[in-house]
C-alpha cells in the first residue's frame, strides 16, 4: 500500500466446504457495493476501485466483473488477476503446461469438489474461459500474471487471448521460473511480480505503463 500510494482492503472471505458457491460469490458482490457506498469514509474513491485476486480470489473477481457487465453495474477501474483458475472442468492432471505437481493437483481437485458440490463447472462465473465474446465485451482493463511452472498457466493465457479478442485492454505476463502462489510465498519471481503490479497500478492511475522487467514474457 505504501509503495503504490493506494488504499488496500484485504478481504477475509468465507470459503468452502462450509460455504460453497454461490455464497462467497454473492458475499463479494455485497462487499463491493458496501465499499462503493463508503469509499470516502474509508479514505478512498468509489471512482477508482481496482480488484485484485490471487488464485481462487482472481477467479472470484473475474466472475464478479462478468456479473457487473450483465447487470449494467458500475465496473471497477481495472483488475489484477494472479495465476487465476479459468477452467474448472476436466481433470487437473490432464492440463498442459507447467510442471505436473501431484500435491497441487490433489489439493486443487479437493477444493473444486468442496466449492462446487453440485457441479456446474461450465458456468462462466466459475470457469470464465467459457464466457462468450459478447459476455466479455466491455470488460475493464486487466493484468493477468501467470507462473511458468503452474498447471493453470495455459488456461489463464488463453483467457487473456479471449479478452483481447473481445476488445479488452489486457496485459498478460508469465513469470519465468515461478510456481503457483509465488507472490505471498515470496519465492522465485515474487520481486518481478510485485514490480509488475505496482507498474500496472500506476498505469491505471495515469495511463502510463512500462514493463519493468523486459525478460518477463
Q: Could you describe each region identified by the protein language model?
A:
Residues 1-217:
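Alpha/beta-hydrolase superfamily serine-hydrolase fold, recognizing
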Amino acid at each position: 500500500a505504501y509503495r503504490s500510494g493506494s488504499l488496500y482492503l484485504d478481504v477475509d472471505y468465507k470459503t468452502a466446504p462450509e460455504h460453497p458457491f454461490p455464497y462467497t460469490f454473492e458475499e463479494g458482490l455485497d462487499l463491493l457495493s458496501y465499499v462503493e457506498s463508503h469509499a470516502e469514509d474509508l479514505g478512498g474513491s468509489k471512482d477508482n476501485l481496482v480488484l485484485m485476486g490471487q488464485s481462487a480470489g482472481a477467479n472470484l473477481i473475474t466472475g464478479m466483473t462478468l456479473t457487473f457487465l450483465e447487470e449494467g453495474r458500475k465496473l471497477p477501474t481495472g483488475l489484477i488477476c494472479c495465476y487465476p483458475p479459468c477452467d474448472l472442468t476436466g481433470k487437473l492432471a490432464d492440463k498442459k503446461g507447467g510442471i505436473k505437481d501431484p500435491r497441487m493437483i490433489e489439493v486443487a481437485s479437493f477444493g473444486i469438489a468442496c466449492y462446487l458440490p453440485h457441479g456446474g463447472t461450465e458456468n462462466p462465473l466459475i470457469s470464465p474461459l467459457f464466457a462468450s465474446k459478447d459476455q466479455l465485451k466491455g470488460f475493464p482493463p486487466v493484468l493477468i500474471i501467470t507462473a511458468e511452472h503452474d498447471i493453470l498457466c495455459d488456461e489463464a493465457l488463453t483467457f487473456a487471448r479471449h479478452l483481447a479478442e473481445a476488445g479488452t485492454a489486457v496485459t498478460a505476463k508469465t513469470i519465468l521460473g515461478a510456481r503457483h502462489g509465488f507472490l505471498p510465498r515470496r519465492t522465485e519471481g515474487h520481486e518481478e511480480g510485485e514490480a509488475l503490479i505496482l507498474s500496472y497500478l500506476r498505469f491505471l492511475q495515469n495511463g502510463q505503463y512500462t514493463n519493468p522487467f523486459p525478460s518477463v514474457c
